Amino acid sequence: TYVEAFPNENDTQTIFDYVFCGNYQPSLRNSLTLKLMRDILQNRVLSILRERENIVYSPYASLFYNGLPQQVFYFDLSASVDWGNTKKVEGLIKEIIHELRTHKVSEEELDAMKKSFLLTKQKVLSNEASAEWRTNLVNLLKNGETIDDFEQYEKFLSSISTTDIRKAFKELVNPDKFVLLYIGKHQKYNE
């Protein structure tokens, strides 16, 4: 775990980024798995930290990955929180990841995400969208994915199971190994 703090003129608010990084084997299936994991994290951050606990503002889960040559990825969970809840937020983020490492997500949740991926692909990569196609093809090659695999996008996406997602969280994301960047104060690290 690495922690870096930055000053904030607002004494009551802390803006944080919990970054969980690792390595992965580049392939379209693995990239899709990472993207599904990102969306699951986004759902959990919203439903638990924002809706249930009501302690964060503007929560967001991002995914950055680079297949070639580094084979690295990272998830960035970011939000703003009253500094008095910073310790609680960290505990809840660790609980969310632990839960995803040990329990499968529901078939319904995963199926809804897969459907969303297919709709987005159809909408963005239409016959008239040459710039989007070019960008997509460059990104495929840059990330160690093949055009042949992309032609089987639906097959790869549908092959990802709830067990695969749980296994990926277990193998790729450790709740105790993260980078924390924050602007403001943190109860745990400013004691």
Kindly give the residue locations of the regions a language model identified.
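Bilobed periplasmic-binding protein-like "clamshell/Venus-flytrap" ligand-binding domains
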Residues: D164-G184
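Generic recognition of flexible, low-complexity loop/linker segments
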Residues: E4-F6, S47, S62-Y65, Y153-K155, ...
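M16 family metallopeptidases and their MPP-like homologs
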Residues: D11-R29, R50-S159, K177-K185
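Helical mechanochemical/support elements of P-loop NTPase systems and associated helical scaffolds
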Residues: V45, S161-D164
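His/Glu-based metal-binding/catalytic segments typifying zinc-dependent metallopeptidases
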Residues: T1-R44
